[in-house]
Amino acid sequence: GPQTALQARIVSLCGGEAGMTMGVLVNRCRKFRREDVEKETAALVAQGALRAETVKGGNGKSVERFIAN
């Protein structure tokens, strides 16, 4: 079905080459609850609108980034 306002916002935020981490997405979607941002992001990955890539950060921690397909 049609994307929700939150889904459309997540996809547009993830439109850059680098993608976005969940923390940044939550910060940019402050009108929405964190759990809703997490749920909608997971749904978008399942639909294929986003892909999740795990990137090793400079501190050796791996971070998941979401990138619009």
Short names for language-model regions:
Residues 16-29:
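Short acidic, hydrophobic short linear motifs in intrinsically disordered regions
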Residues 1, 39, 56:
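Phosphate-binding/switch region of NTP-binding enzymes
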Residues 5, 20, 35, 39:
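Charged, alpha-helix-enriched surfaces in structured cytosolic catalytic cores
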Residues 45-56:
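A short, conserved structural fragment
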Residues 31-46:
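Short amphipathic alpha-helical interaction segments
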Residues 11, 26, 38-41:
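Generic hydrophobic alpha-helical scaffold/packing signal
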Residues 1-11:
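Short alpha-helical segments that sit at the start of domains
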Residues 55-69:
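Short, cationic-aromatic polyanion-contact patches
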